[in-house]
Amino acid sequence: MTTPLSGAHGDEPDDGRATRPDAQTPARARRWVLPVIAVAATLVVVAAIAVVGIVAGDAGPTATPTATPSVTPNATASPDALSFERPADWDPARPGFHLTPEAHWINDPQRPFFAGGLWHLYYLYNADYPNGNGTEWYHATSSDLVTWHNEGVAIEKYRNGLGDILTGSAVVDTTGSAGFGAGAVVALVTQQDDGVQRQSLFYSTDDGYTFAEYDGNPVMDNPGVVDWRDPKVIRDEAHDRWVMVLAEGARLGFYTSPDLRSWTYVSDFVRDDLGLLECPDLFEMIDPESGRRTWILAASADGAASGRTTGFAYWTGTWDGERFTADDTDPLWLDDGADFYAAVTWDDPRRTGDDRLTERSALAWMNNWAYARDLPADQWQGGALSTTRTIVLDEVDGRLRLRSRPADGVRGLEGAVQSAPAHVVEPGAIAPLAVQPATSSYRMRVSFDRPESGEVRLRLADNGDSSVTVGFDSEAGVAFVTRADDDAADRMPDAYRTVRTSAQPTGDIVSFDVLVDAGSVEVFLGDGSSLTMAIHPGDSPHVTVESTSAPVQVRSLWIAPMAIIDPND
C-alpha cells in the first residue's frame, strides 16, 4: 500500500530483474490520497440490570453455525497472569487488547510467519509522523496470535537509496532457494522513491529480528507503471517454485521465480470496477464439510459501486501455476464493516497435508482512508490492528464462501463471565442490558429469536446523547452497526456515518459475538459473516437494549472482561 507522507529519498537504482512483456500504465479507477491520523476512541461500557428473567444460566448462544462453533466461556476467575486494569498513564483511546505501537503511526499488517517457536508479524510504522516521510517494518511476536509484543523496527527506511519500506510479504525459505541458507526469512517489499515503486529483497538469518539488504536490489524494477506494489509471495509446491501477486492499479499481476530473486511475469487478473487494488493475496483452501478445494485470489478494494466501502474482496477459482480463473466475476467480501483493510491471511505450517488447508487466520488494519486523518488521537496515530480471526470455507447454495470467527486464543484473554437468564425484551422501551461488562474491553455473546418485525438495537456507551448501535433489522434481513450518533460523528465525513450491514436473510435465531475495545467493535454473526468498525463513543458506562416493534425472546447472554495487553511491556 502507498503510505502516508511517502516522499522522494535516495538515488535512482540500477535496473532490476523482473521480465515483463508490457509496460503500459494500467487503467486506474481511482487514485487514493493516503492521509495520516489515527482512529482513536474512548469506550467505557457498563450496563445496569433490567429485564425479566425466565430461564437461568445459559452460558452461550444456542445457534452454532458451521463457521462459528460454540465457545464455552471460562466461568472461573481469570488467571493471575492476566490484568484487567488499564495503566493509569494510557490514553483513554488506547485499545486494551488490540495491537498498537507505543507512539507514532501504524497501518498495513504484513502476513505473519512461524519461526523459532513464535509467530512473527510486521506492520507499517512511521516514527517521523507527522513531520517526516515514510514507513518501515515494525516487528511484533506472539505465541498465540492474540497477545503481541513489540520488538522494534526490523527493516529500516531510507537506508539504501530506494526510498521507504512499503507493504510486502516475508516467507521462510526452508530449502535455502534464495541462497541465504535453509530457514532464512526472505522479505519482498515495495520501496518507493520519487513516486516510483520497485520491489526489493531483504533477508534474515535470526528468525526475522534483523534483516540484511540483498546487494542486487531492486530485484524488480518498475516497467513504467504508476501503481506497482504490495508483493504477496507464496510457495507453489505443485509447480516447485515461488509465486508473487503484485498490485498494479486495476489489475493483479502474477510472477514466478525459482529463487525469490529473479521474477518472470506470467499473467494478470483485471478488474476496473473496484478502484485501486492493494495488498493482494493468493491461497488454497478445502471445505472441511464437503471436501471441495478452491484457490482464492483476494485484494483490498473499493466496493463503492455496490454500495460498500473499502475492504477485503476475494474470488474463488482455479490456479494452474500461471493463471487464476475465477468461478464468478463478482467478488465476495470477508467483512462487511467499514474498517477491515489491508487484510492478510496465513495458515499454520505445523499442520500437514489437507488438514493445513482447512482453516486460515486473518487480521487487518482497522481504519479507512476516507476518514483516517479525521479521527481524534493523542499518543499514537493510525488506529490498531484487528483481532486475529479464524476463517474457513463454507458452501452456500453451491458457492464456496469464507466464514469468520474470533481466533481460539481470544478465549484465553477472557475473565470471569457474567451471564443472564433467558428473558423477553418488550417493544417500545429502551432498557438497560440484563448484565453489565466490568471493564471497557469485553466480549459479549447474545442470541435471540428473530423478531417478527422491527429492529433489535444494542446501544453501546449510551448516555442518551451519543452511542454506537449494534442491531438487527428483521424486515430488511440484515445485521447492522451504526456510529452516526457517536461522539465523533458530527465532525466526520459522510462515509463514517454510513450504516454498515451484513445480510442475514434466513434462520430463526440471530447470534452476535461482539468484541468491544477502546476505539473498535468487531461483530461476528451466527452465519460466519462479520462487521468490523472503528468507533469513538463517549464515556458513558451504559449499554441499553431496545426492540422497536415486537417482543424479542433472548435465549442467552453473557459478558466477559478482556485482559489488558501492553505490547510494549
Annotate the PLM regions.
Residues 32, 46-72:
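C-terminal region of N-terminal signal peptides and the immediate post-cleavage residues
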Residues 289, 318-330, 334-569:
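Beta-rich accessory regions
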Residues 3-4, 20, 26, 43, ...:
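N-terminal compositionally biased, intrinsically disordered segments and leader/signal-like regions
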Residues 3-4, 69-231, 235-278, 286-336, ...:
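Beta-rich carbohydrate-recognition and catalytic domains
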Residues 15, 21, 38, 60-64, ...:
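Compositionally biased, low-complexity segments enriched in small residues
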Residues 1-32:
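Terminal targeting segments of Actinobacterial cell-envelope proteins
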Residues 26-41, 52:
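N-terminal Sec-pathway targeting helices
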